[in-house]
Design a protein with these regions (language model features):
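Mature extracytoplasmic enzyme cores
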Residues: 1-146
Length: 146
């Protein structure tokens, strides 16, 4: 399983998994590979005009082999609805997860970056992460993360 590190030097890190899940929360000077914080996940709620609302955890389905020696456990809320699939692409310092689900009336992708030092944020590699707050167009909503 992939765990793309998000975080700068001395800032700790959170891993972005291939399904779009947040994992390996290594913050507050605590190494924690393989661990996920309880109920720490983005979600999506969307409603097309004239259609029922749809809500999902914003990550692809959990597929075997399941994580952990005791299966899914309760930390990652396995009973909540997730998306059908995801495609992960990444080349340090940037990663992108494109989500796929026929039930969603929108296309969803998560883009994340990991600066090694603060001045990297002004480099061309980070131009696509330039929103200080949410950025939106008719086809795209961008939320800065992290």
């Amino acid at each position: 399983m992939i765990s793309f590190p998000l975080g700068g030097i001395g800032a700790g890190s959170i891993g972005l998994g291939g399904r779009g899940q947040l994992r390996d929360w290594e913050i507050f000077n605590k190494p924690d590979k393989g661990n996920s914080l309880q109920y720490s996940f983005p979600s999506i709620w969307v409603q097309a005009e004239g259609a029922p609302a749809v809500a999902h955890v914003l990550e692809a389905r959990i597929e075997p082999p399941y994580e952990g020696q005791n299966g899914l456990g309760s930390r990652n809320a396995p009973g909540l609805s997730r998306l059908e699939g995801a495609t992960f692409t990444g080349e340090f310092p940037a990663a992108k997860v494109e989500f796929h689900d026929a039930r969603l009336p929108v296309q969803v992708a998560l883009e994340a970056g990991s600066p090694s030092f603060p001045s990297m944020l002004t480099s061309p590699a980070y131009q696509w992460l330039s929103c200080a707050t949410a950025c939106a167009t008719p086809d795209e909503l961008r939320l800065p993360f992290p």
